[in-house]
Swiss-Prot record:
Residues 158-168 have a biased composition (Basic residues). Its main location: Golgi. Residues 22-111, 140-183 are annotated as: Disordered. Residues 51-79, 246-296, 326-346 form a coiled coil. The keyword Cell membrane does not apply. It is found in: Golgi apparatus. This is G kinase-anchoring protein 1-A. Keywords: Coiled coil, Golgi apparatus.
Length: 361
């Protein structure tokens, strides 16, 4: 079950997958296979023809291995910037090309390789985590099945399968099963077991929790890697403001940066001066506001006092006017009385005069 699941999980291909390690085990295994096949070969012309065909195949394989090794060495030299050996002509051509390629292109290639490595490592880590998850699920299911009782295939069937495999191995030893057929058989067996095995509704929450925990762990590690990458970029001297440019543009950029820094310092000093002036003006304005408020209060108090005085004067004048008006009316009445008496007195005089005149005649 575990091998089938591991084969089902997709794995990411890296640029180091092409690199092959030379080991004597492959040659020993090939020699053993050749000896085994030659020992079991039939005598006669058919055996000789087979041996010739095997020798041709071996020569082709050796040529392919040499080509793959040369390509792997070239890839190693490109990846790690090593000086390749001068043995093979293809490596010499690669050395000439690496010398002719400019430094800028090499650095760009190196950055691209770094990005690819980061992506590949993250993908491989996720794939490994998925594999571990699936394996843990399978182990959990197997342990639960073992605890509840063997719900799978009975032992008689297992024994029959083993006997069949032994018989097949004894009969068809020279035949080899390809990887694809083996994986397809494992997949079919897994599907049949999944169909046979009853669903586990109680364990869905457990697996969901496992997946959530794994996703959280992946996110945390990605954040940590990102933060470490950012800090390393800022800490490394490669992050310094000196990119590899042509025609001495780095010096020009340095001078411009220095000028900008000087301008920034000047602007900061000007801003500090203006801040001090602004504080002084603010203090003065606050003082003026206080003075104006005090002056307004004084003016208001004086005006109120004047209004009170005027009101008192008005009251006094109204009293005087009323008294004068009463005296005037009294005088008018007196004048009227005197006029009436005068009229009476004048009338008496006229009557006396007329009487005297009549008496004198």
């Amino acid at each position: 079950m575990a091998s089938a699941v591991v084969s089902m999980v997709p794995t990411t291909a890296s640029r180091f997958a092409l690199l092959q390690v030379d080991s004597s085990s492959d040659s020993d295994s090939e020699k053993a296979r050749g000896a085994h096949s030659s020992g079991k070969a039939h005598s006669g012309s058919a055996a000789r023809g087979k041996n010739k065909g095997n020798e041709k195949k071996k020569e082709k394989r050796r040529k392919k291995k040499e080509q793959q090794q040369s390509e792997a060495n070239e890839l190693r030299n490109l990846a790690f910037k090593k000086i390749p050996p001068k043995a093979s002509p293809g490596v010499a051509v690669q050395e000439h090309l690496t010398h002719t390629v400019p430094k800028v292109a090499q650095e760009e290639d190196w950055q691209q390789w770094q990005q690819r490595d980061v992506q590949l490592t993250s993908d491989m880590y996720e794939a490994d985590l998925e594999k571990a998850l699936i394996l843990s699920k399978l182990e959990f299911e197997e342990s639960k099945d073992n605890g509840n009782g063997d719900n799978g295939v009975p032992q008689s069937k297992k024994v029959n399968k083993k006997d069949k495999r032994k018989n097949n191995q004894g009969k068809d030893k020279p035949l080899t099963v390809p990887l694809k057929d083996f994986q397809l058989e494992d997949k079919h067996a897994k599907k049949q077991e999944e169909l046979k095995s009853p669903p586990l509704p109680q364990d869905s929450g457990f697996f969901n929790k496992l997946e959530e925990d794994v996703t959280k762990i992946i996110l945390k590690e990605k954040r940590k890697e990102h933060s470490t990458d950012v800090t390393e970029q800022f800490a490394t001297p490669e992050y310094s403001m000196e990119p590899v440019l042509k025609d001495g543009r780095t010096e020009v950029l340095k001078q411009e940066i220095e000028k900008k820094e000087v301008e920034l310092k000047q602007m900061k000093s000007i801003i500090s001066q203006w801040e001090a002036k602004y504080r002084e003006v603010k203090a003065r304005n606050s003082q003026l506001l206080k003075m104006l408020q005090e002056g307004e209060m004084k003016d208001k108090a004086e005006i109120l006092l004047q209004v009170d005085e005027l009101l008192s004067i008005k009251n006094e004048l109204t009293l005087q006017v009323t008294t004068l008006h009463a005296a005037l009316e009294q005088e008018r009445s007196k004048v009227k009385i005197l006029q009436a008496e005068q009229v009476k007195y004048q009338g008496g005089k006229k009557s006396k005069r007329t009487a005297e005149l009549e008496h004198g005649r």
